[in-house]
UniProtKB/Swiss-Prot annotation:
Reaction catalysed by this enzyme: 2 a Fe(II)-siderophore + NAD(+) + H(+) = 2 a Fe(III)-siderophore + NADH; 2 a Fe(II)-siderophore + NADP(+) + H(+) = 2 a Fe(III)-siderophore + NADPH
EC number: 1.16.1.10
Native source species: Archaeoglobus fulgidus (strain ATCC 49558 / DSM 4304 / JCM 9628 / NBRC 100126 / VC-16)
Cross-referenced Pfam families: Flavin_Reduct (PF01613)
Residues the record lists as binding NADP(+): 7, 126, 147-154
Keywords: Flavoprotein, FMN, NADP, Nucleotide-binding, Oxidoreductase
Name used for this protein in its record: Ferric-chelate reductase (NAD(P)H)
Function text: Catalyzes the reduction of bound ferric iron (Fe(3+)) in a variety of iron chelators (siderophores) using NAD(P)H as the electron donor, resulting in the release of Fe(2+). Not active with uncomplexed Fe(3+). Also reduces FMN and FAD, but not riboflavin.
Assembly information from the UniProt record: Homodimer.
Length: 169
């Protein structure tokens, strides 16, 4: 199978957040999409090994920050290559608390969306969380960061827990 074909699928790059038991969690994700408009539902797909996955499962809510094209790699790395349980990802980061209590990262974000989980779907290594939007806000008029930009312009790597990770042969 030519795994390069999967790299041709277009994705955005987002920070998915949640809070459980007083601990804020956040991670980079590329699998975020709108499902319906009435009611407005979005889905996020998170690896079961990630702290953010567990926080969403426990709290029943999540936030999504749509990243701008100019997001620095250091900022992406802060949320993409460290566990929330081992590093305070939100120290020094601009964010606000949403209606459900989840942190919404506003720094380098074009928009933020907040949702309450209405359904979960186990897809093996990951869980697809379907959420009904409770709030959304456009923060600035800027180009959004895509997964292709992350790889081509920023020379970003794919973590082992990503939905699009394939082991090298």
């Amino acid at each position: 199978m030519d795994v390069e074909a999967f790299y041709k699928i277009s994705y955005g790059l987002y920070i998915v957040t949640s809070e459980s038991n007083g601990r804020k969690c956040g991670q980079i994700a590329n699998t975020v999409f709108q499902l319906t408009s009435k009611p407005v539902q979005i889905a996020v797909c998170l690896n079961k090994e990630n702290d953010t996955h567990n926080a969403v499962k426990e709290s029943g809510a999540f936030g999504v920050s749509v990243l701008e094209l100019e997001t620095p790699m250091e900022f992406i790395g802060r949320f993409g290559f460290r566990k929330s349980s081992e590093f305070e990802k939100f120290d020094g980061v601009e964010y606000k608390t949403g209606k459900t209590g989840v942190p919404l990262v506003t720094q380098h974000a074009v928009a933020v969306i907040e949702a309450k989980v209405v359904k979960e779907c186990d897809v093996g290594t990951h869980t697809l969380f379907v959420g009904e939007a409770v709030d959304a806000e456009v923060l600035k008029d800027a180009e959004v960061l895509t997964y292709a930009d992350y790889h081509l312009m920023k020379k970003g790597k794919t973590p082992r827990t990503a939905t699009v990770y394939f082991e090298s042969k």
